[in-house]
Amino acid sequence: RQRLDSSHVIGLVSHMSRLECVQETLRLALEALEPIEALARPVAWSVWWERYVASKLDYRTEAEPLRAKMAQAGQDAHDLLRWAKGQEGARAARKAVELLERVYAENFEEASGEAVDQRRAQPPGAVHNPHDPEAQWSTKKTTAQKEWVGYKVQVAETVEAQPRAAKEPTR
C-alpha cells in the first residue's frame, strides 16, 4: 500500500515586491561583476552602483515614482545585460548575470530593442527573491488563506500489508 501526503516548506527568504526583486538582482549582478577592471566597465557603472548597491528603496514613496523606478531598473538591467554579453571578465559572474537575465525576462518586455515595458503579470515559476530563485510564491485557499514563498513537498510512504485476523482494527 502507498500513502501520499503533501506539505509546504517555507523558504528562508523575505517576501519582496517585484521592484525589490529586480533591484536586488541588479545589486547582486553588479557586486559579482565588480572585479572587472574599471577601464572595462561601462560609463554608467558609477550611476548603477550608487542606485542599486549604495542606496536602499524607500517604501513610503508614492506609486508614480515607484513605477518610474521600475522602468529605470528595467532599462538599467537591459543595458547591463547587453554590456555583460560582450565581456570576457563577465564569465566569472555567469550565474549572477544569468539570474539577472531571467528576472529581466520575467518582469519586462522589449518594445523596440531599447525601451522596456513592465509585464502585467509574472509567469508561473517566476523568481520572487534572488537569494533563493527556486523558491516559489504559493497560496492555499482554505478557511484562512495561506500565502508563502518556499517549496511544495510530496511524500510517498510505502507500507507492506500486514496479515491480520478477522475483525482486527487497522493500524
Language model regions located:
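Polybasic low-complexity intrinsically disordered regions
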Residues: 1-171
